[in-house]
Amino acid sequence: MAENRGERRAAVENRYDAWDHEQAMKAAVRKFISYDQFSAQLRNWREARLNIIEHATSVLSQVSNLGRTHFYSRTERFGGSSLVGDKLYVCLNETRMKTALNNIIVALQTVNGEGRARRLGPREASANTGGEDSALNVAHQLAEVDDLLTDESFLREAVFTQDKYELVNGLRWAGAXQLTAQAFWFDVNAAIDEIDNRLLAAAALRLLPGQANHVDGLVSINYAQLDRALSVVGGNILPQTLEITRDERKRQLPEVRVIDGERVTIRNKDEATVIRNHGQGLPWLLAFLLLLLSVVVVYSTIYLNDWLYRLSVVRHGKPGGGAARKLSGMSDWLCSRLRARGALNVNRMRKKQACDPSPTGLRKFLTCYNFSYELWDPTGSYDDAQRRIIAEQNSFVEAVRAIDEGDRELAEACLTNVRRILRRHLNYRPDYFDIIEAKAVYLVTVLTNAMSGPVVGVDDDERRAVVAAFNPSDCGLPNLDSCSLDEIKNFDLSEVVIGEGTNVEQARGYLNLCRNIQCMIETIGTVQFLGVLSSYTGPQYPCISQAFAEDKRIRKERLKDKDNITTADIIAYLVSGVMVAYALVAVSKGGITLFKFMKNYAGGGGDRPGSSRRIRQLEAALPSLPQPEELTMMERLRRPQSSDNDLALRRNPSDMLSQVVRDVVADVDSSDIAESLNDPARMTEAALEIRLTRIMSAEGSPVDVIEPGGQELISMQVHGESLTVINAGTDSPTVIRSASLSTRHRSSGIEIGSFAVDKVLPYEVEGENDDHGDAGKKPTVAQALMIGGGAVKGQGNLGVTNGKELLKVLGSSRSIGKMSGKMAV
């Protein structure tokens, strides 16, 4: 079955697809030569500059026949079908190269002094001077060609590899062992730029054929370009934020003029390269805005600190002073924290150790790894655990170095080692690992191509016979000609043990081939697999074909999801924009409102009111407010409504006096009441007065009299409510509810003045004209008792003549009705 597959592959003709007349004309006209052969020939000519004149005919023939046309054709691949790796070729049709070679040919043709004769004339020229003239001219032209081989623009335009030339001209090689088509997401321009970047890096490091292998001094390397060159392998692996188009103008050739018989070479200054950036630059804009915001925050923190302090001093005791003082304190705290953090970082930088052989130190090293190849020194007083960590760091660095240097044999093992160390010490995938993995997978793919390709010194028939004679199942290895993608992916090659036998070397090579294929297919669906797609030219095993199909399916699904998400993202961006605009408006309004509040209402840092402006506004609006009615207390009592400020429901003064008498009688002994009822003649005013005095002395007066500052105060309980009377000894006592006073301890006395206006009830003894308002008809206690008891009115001299006596009488009772008199606020 394998033989039939080989016959079918051999039946497919190797050729270029899309070959047309234009491609045929290019192949017939263009002359190519390998870069190493051309540089070696050029070095020989420069070392034997004087001998060139002696062998002018031979050298002229070499220069004239340099390179060859029909370097490739429809059925002959550019550079050869069995090419492995990157081999450089120079196009001799490039304008500057063609002009330099023509000048060398002209100089060699004038060996007999023709060039000097043209400048000085035939009389002054001699035949033996032509060699010196031609040798000098040839030396200049050879130096120019040597400089041209390392020129940046020349490397981009006239130096090609097999892949670069096919990508530039749109050629696609179709054969039995090659890919028939490129992936639809393959970026040709990015692949060409990747090859050019490698050429430029090799020229800067003096690694091109013919360059000196040593450089005086240190070599400056642009690590940003180097990282991009390492990451972009065979395609546009890393997505670019900005689309860059390079607009380069070709170098103008030196102009040769004849002035006064002398040939003068005029070199024009090359124009600078113009690079235009266009495309989606939103991430760069956001980065710039964040940088600008950071600068504004830092500057505001530094500048506003002093400004807020001055503001807090100026506004002390004024509106906004308290808020300014708090903001100044917050700014001082923030500045102190920034200074402390900066001092801590500086101290850490000063005391930074060469290495930190601890799990935390290695984790920090792996997190901040920047492709440095500095190894930790294991010599020192370290324990076993620290030495193991140092060994892991050295192993990691050496593995990355081997991958970076392009060691194809160790690429798979080094990548496995790097993965193992990262998985052990980090719980995430760092960004730089994509660069390492892309380069390693590319090297593994190139090695797989070489292992599957022809062997030097062994013909194809013999190689196929050896492969057919080897049976992988005998060594416990999977058969790549029949196993599927899942089988090779899930096969554990670590358990395979190669025993002693006749096919040990072949079994080990087959095992390495299986490991390389496993390493390649592990990157299916990632950007690293693009390197496999673009560079794999080995046999199309079933697992390889399934891997390509699976990767294509995954990318199509992602592209479809990306298109669907794009529409949703547009809607989300619009909604976010509206919300941001609304938030900005709300923040602006809130800021204005807060500023007005801080200006008008915020309390100052001193004793002044919070806002004199607000007070003036209230004073201006006061005349327009409705004024309260000026009514007397009796007018309010006569209204058919009750108020919570009244002491009780309003009643007739006679009823109130009768109630007082009844309350007094209730405290009298029942035997006295019965005696007075049986013998009313004994109940004279003197007897009643004596009885009343005895009762009052027995119970004690519930009235406390305090005289602070000449004002007599009386505290009494009326209907369960505590009252305080001011100016009780005058004709106009003032009654105050004690609940309206400030709550203070009894030892500190009564605080005068801190009560509500509506709680003050002035009382005038000279009341309105009623049954008891006339001075001649003021009732005595005896009369009150007589009225309350229903007896006849007696005679006595105990009368209520002022407010103090009335309050004392009222205070001696358990309950009190409404007082008679004029009550007003």
From Swiss-Prot:
The keyword Transport does not apply. It comes from the Viruses. It is found in: Virion. The gene is CP-CP2. Keywords: Capsid protein, Virion. This is 91 kDa readthrough protein. Minor capsid protein involved in virus transmission by the vector Polymyxa. GO terms for cellular component: viral capsid. Its main location: virion. It holds the Pfam family TMV_coat. One of its GO terms (molecular function) is structural molecule activity. InterPro entries: TMV-like_coat, TMV-like_coat_sf. Disulfide bonds: none annotated. The keyword Transcription does not apply. Belongs to the virgaviridae capsid protein family.
